[in-house]
A protein has these predicted regions:
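Core alpha/beta catalytic barrel or barrel-like domain that forms the active/cofactor pocket
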Residues: 157-168, 189-203
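Active-site and adjacent substrate-binding regions of carbohydrate-active enzymes
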Residues: 87, 169, 179, 197-203, ...
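Catalytic and substrate-binding clefts that recognize carbohydrates or anionic sugar/phosphate headgroups
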Residues: 1-161, 168-170, 174, 181-186
Length: 208
């Protein structure tokens, strides 16, 4: 079962493909806190999710920010990487229900997953306008399937995207890129794509 809650006046993100009616009831599992939500975790609870983030598959014991950050040093002390996947899959532990949480919000979301207090998960959005989905029913796999149905099928990249990519910082001209392609061909090396690094952007700013 998927329950949908709306707070404020959220921006449409087109992240959800199913039309889930907005619930007027209380949000299950979570307790409202100043600026966000909290969940009391059992000692054996496990928290999965957040997509491309540092540290292990169990996110418990650390804090995160979904912020689409071009972080050059991928170390375990970082809070953000490239991706922003605001989905948590929570195994409540022995005798407790599993459930999923999806925050549909286009800005920063902060998570404290047992970092400040090991038995407490907290998350908050930088603005009060967002959609919240709580997913229940069955095991973790069943909850994941419901989430996939909620957001629709993933984009399937073209075949060449699974090939060999050459990327570096510092190509100055188009001729530099063509020369790389020529060198690969002359040396009989496979090459499916050439990527330019962040220096092609205006003042290294995203999306320029």
């Amino acid at each position: 079962m998927i329950q949908h809650f709306r707070f404020g006046a959220p921006l449409p993100t087109d992240s959800v493909v199913q039309d889930i009616p907005v619930s007027a009831g209380p949000v299950p599992f979570l307790a409202a806190e100043k600026g966000g939500w909290g969940y009391r975790m059992a000692p054996d609870a496990i928290v999965y999710g957040l997509g491309e983030m540092p540290r292990g598959i169990n996110k418990r014991g650390w804090h995160y920010v979904t912020n689409n950050t071009d972080e050059s040093r991928h170390s375990e002390d970082k809070l953000s990487y490239y991706g922003a996947h605001n989905f948590l899959l929570i195994d409540g532990g022995a005798g407790r229900e599993c459930f999923g949480v999806f925050i549909d919000f286009p800005g920063k979301v902060r998570y404290d997953i047992g970092y400040t207090e090991y038995d407490t998960l907290r998350f908050s959005t930088e603005e009060p306008d967002y959609e919240l989905y709580i997913i229940t029913g069955g095991d973790l796999n069943a909850i994941s399937r419901q989430f996939r149905q909620l957001i629709g099928r993933s984009y399937i990249p073209p075949k060449w995207a699974f090939g060999l990519a050459q990327s570096r910082f510092g190509y100055k001209t188009a001729e530099d890129v063509r020369e790389v392609a020529r060198q690969y061909k002359e040396n009989d090396l496979p090459l499916d794509m050439i990527c330019m690094d962040i220096d092609y952007m205006q003042d290294y700013a995203d999306f320029t």
